[in-house]
Structure formats: C-alpha cells, structure tokens
Amino acid sequence: SDEETALLTPFEDPKEAAEYLLGTGVRLVAVTLGSEGVLICSRDGSRKVSGFVSHVVDTTGAGDSFWGAFVSQLIRADKSLEEFSIDELEEFARYGNAVASLCVEKRGGLRSIPEESETFERLAVK
C-alpha cells in the first residue's frame, strides 16, 4: 500500500517506490492507494487505475479482497509475469478494485466478499 512504500524503499511516493522496486528485479509492483485505486507498474509501463465509487460501511477486508481478486486474475490467465501487458494488468486491477469497492459496502470480513456476478455488475458501471 502507499503507507508501506516508505518501509520497503527509500521513497514515500508510490511511483518512485515502484520504479525503485522494478530496478531491483521485481517484475510486477502494485501499490494500493485506498479509495483512489491502485498503481500498477511492470517493465511494460505503469498505470494508475482508479477505484470505484462506493458507499463505505466498513473497510475490513478491503485490501485482502483486492489482492485475492487481483491475484486470481493473474492465475486464471496462466502466463508468466513478464508476458502480461500493462493493459492486461490494468484490467486485473479494475477487477480487484471492483471487488474491494463492493466489500466495503457491507459489514464484516468474510461476509462482505461479493459474488462474482456482483463484481461483473460493478465492472459494467464504469
């Protein structure tokens, strides 16, 4: 997350931190930015992927739900990290953002994780 970039790198700015990490050999960097979305960086480029508008009830599980959704898309694509274009990574990040935006609209952790059909509905809004 943007709060942790200073712990992992000499930089507080998410973009600078991501570029630093790529320079160390990391192949994919995703810095979550709370309600603002996520910054995705790879050797193919970088993108800030906006979050979705949601009625926030409880932020419990938002980060975990983003990461679960994002990583699930990487796994489903069945490619190595180097093969993903920045456009593909942006779509995976949008999916993760959609899941997280739905998660914060309900109370609790596990019960707030949306069904995939709800996620597709949210993706269609934007």
What do these predicted regions represent?
Residues 1:
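Residue-level signal for inorganic ion chemistry
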Residues 4:
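Active-site rim beta-loop-alpha module in soluble metabolic enzymes
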Residues 7:
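Small/polar glycine-rich anion-binding or flexible loop at a beta-alpha turn
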Residues 10-126:
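Conserved phosphate-binding/catalytic region of the ribokinase-like
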